[in-house]
Amino acid sequence: MALKNVPFRSEVLAWNSDNLADYFRKLNYRDCEKAVKKYHIDGARFLNLTENDIQKFPKLRMPLLSKLSQDINKNEERRSIFTRKPQIPRFLEETESHEEDDGGWSSFEDDYESPNDDDPDGEDDGDYESPNEEEQALVDDAADYEPPPSNNEEALQSSILPPNSFHNTNSMYIDRPPTGKVSQQPPVPPLRPKPALPPLPTGRNHSPLSPPHPNHEEPSRSGNNKTAKLPAPSIDRSTKPPLDRSLAPLDREPFILGKKPPFSDKPSAPLGREHLPKIQKPPLPPAMDRHERNERLGPVTTRKPPVPRHGRGPDRRENDEDDVHQRPLPQPSLPSMSSNTFPSRSVQPSSKNTFPLAHMPGAFSESNIGFQQSASLPPYFSQGPGNRPPLRSEGRNLPLPVPNRPQPPSPGEEETPLDEEWYVSYITRPEAEAALRKINQDGTFLVRDSSKKTANNPYVLMVLYKDKVYNIQIRYQEESQVYLLGTGLRGKEDFLSVSDIIDYFRKMPLLLIDGKNRGSRYQCTLTHAAGCL
């Protein structure tokens, strides 16, 4: 649609829903007319159509209506250049625009509105001409009368009177006061022309009044700045000696405001550093105690602390394997000595170990050295608890292990007691997995030496479950001389020996956690031993 046939944006903004409906009736958009009346869409709303508003019109008309709305907005933009300038003399338009010739300029109005006369409905033409005669005539005349306002400068001077205050300055600078004040301070004005120019747009009426005060104050400020610069080096010189920390407390008093924060901050840093080593030092003494313990235990055994713990055990275990029922004497003494920690872990040993404690309280002193006697547990179960107090009280076999093997071959110590169907001493992880997969049943397990082979991580328990091999560390705690299974984060179950761990989880399910998938939780008992394969 040509812009000549499109009404101006200013007109459409003033339309109500009835005027917009009449316009659509004029364009033969009966369906749009109904939508406008139904939803009460006025001209301003039509020019700023939203997605919700345009959906209210028929779908076939939506492209045409959006194009029409754009054309109306563009039609006003072309005339906006002329309408901006006459906004100031609008007060004069009411008095002068009607006095000017309407004959020549009415032809321009006809030129702009003649396309509207071509519309089929004559009634609508009257509707469009009536606002043009009253409102649009003023805008068009003002737009086209740009030369006449230049001729009517005498009439417009009343509205431009505020800028006449510039003549009072009698100088090229707008912000300058009378010449008398300027002459008093000739050197200062050239220094301050740039900062004085910005206040001009804020208010020209007050421009001659506001600058004189800063002009009088500026020299005083500049003088103050010069005087302030003189003590400034004295302050810097005074701050130089306090940089020495030895003189800092003496210099703090004259410079309380500016100097206390830096000195107060600096000592705070070393104080924090002094506290840091204090926090780190406490763990060091226990480490020294550990070395002292190792040195004290050195003459007894040359290996790590878990090994001397087995120093007495291997003798008894070898004897137990040869003749379990013939040597019951050393067996009851060991569980009875370590019963302080054992009852909290397993049910069977705890029920039988609690009895000797009441009868033999003094046996705990020897239990700290050797208490990992897993192979001796089956004979305990075969024997009654009543046999233990007399056997322990006799104490015949207690000194035997110490003189016979005070320092036996340490590797053989742990191999012989653990050399059962589920223990393999030196084997790699792939070989151990192959041994487990030979049986290939859930609950297949074995115990092998850890690749680290340290005092804290001596063994590894490998379990096959659902075609996946789980490696669980068997840790040794030197302080309490007990074995722990896993990381100990999920719970703390300590055992006197590795055999106790195997015996316990043969009856109780073992929690298996996948390192890659922490959400998986499986439980199984140790059923099939793969150590002899």
Swiss-Prot record:
Record organism: Mus musculus
Q: Which residues form a coiled coil?
A: none
Location(s) in or outside the cell: Cytoplasm
Q: Enumerate the spans annotated as SH2 domain.
A: 422-530
Report keywords, A-Z. Cytoplasm, Phosphoprotein, SH2 domain
UniProt modified residues of type Phosphoserine: S207, S210, S376, S410
Query: In its keyword annotation, does this UniProt entry include Transferase?
Result: no
| Purpose | Adapter protein primarily involved in signaling pathways within T-cells, as well as other immune cells such as platelets, mast cells, and natural killer (NK) cells. Plays a crucial role for transducing signal from the T-cell receptor (TCR) after antigen recognition leading to T-cell activation. Mechanistically, once phosphorylated by the kinase ZAP70, mediates interactions with the guanine-nucleotide exchange factor VAV1, the adapter protein NCK and the kinase ITK.
The annotated regions of Acidic residues compositional bias extend over 94-144
Tell me if Protein biosynthesis is a UniProt keyword of this record: no
PANTHER family, alphabetically?
LYMPHOCYTE CYTOSOLIC PROTEIN 2, SH2 DOMAIN CONTAINING PROTEIN
Question: Self-association or partners: how does it assemble?
Answer: Interacts with SLA. Interacts with CBLB. Interacts with GRB2. Interacts with SHB. Interacts with PRAM1. Interacts (via SH2 domain) with CD6 (via tyrosine phosphorylated C-terminus). Interacts with FYB1 and the phosphorylated form of FYB2. Interacts with 14-3-3 adapter/YWHAZ; this phosphorylation leads to YWHAZ proteolytic degradation. Interacts with VAV1; this interaction plays a role in TCR-mediated cytokine production. Interacts with AGER; this interaction plays an important role in AGER-mediated pro-inflammatory responses and cytokine release.
Residues with Phosphotyrosine modification: Y23
UniProt protein name? Lymphocyte cytosolic protein 2
Q: Which SUPFAM superfamilies did the record assign?
A: SAM/Pointed domain, SH2 domain
Composition bias (Polar residues) maps to: 151-172, 340-354
Transmembrane regions:
none
Query: Compositionally biased, Pro residues: which spans?
Result: 186-201, 400-411
Q: Please tell me where this protein is predominantly located.
A: cytoplasm
Any GO BP annotation: mast cell activation
Recorded hits in PROSITE patterns, A to Z, give:
SH2
Q: In which tissues is it expressed?
A: Highly expressed in spleen, thymus, and peripheral blood leukocytes.
Q: Pfam families from the entry?
A: SAM_2, SH2
Q: Which SMART domains match?
A: SAM (SM00454), SH2 (SM00252)
The organism's place on the tree of life at top rank = Eukaryota
Q: Where is this region: Disordered?
A: 78-359, 374-419
Q: How is it modified after translation?
A: Phosphorylated after T-cell receptor activation by ZAP70, ITK and TXK, which leads to the up-regulation of Th1 preferred cytokine IL-2. SYK-dependent phosphorylation is required for recruitment of PI3K signaling components.
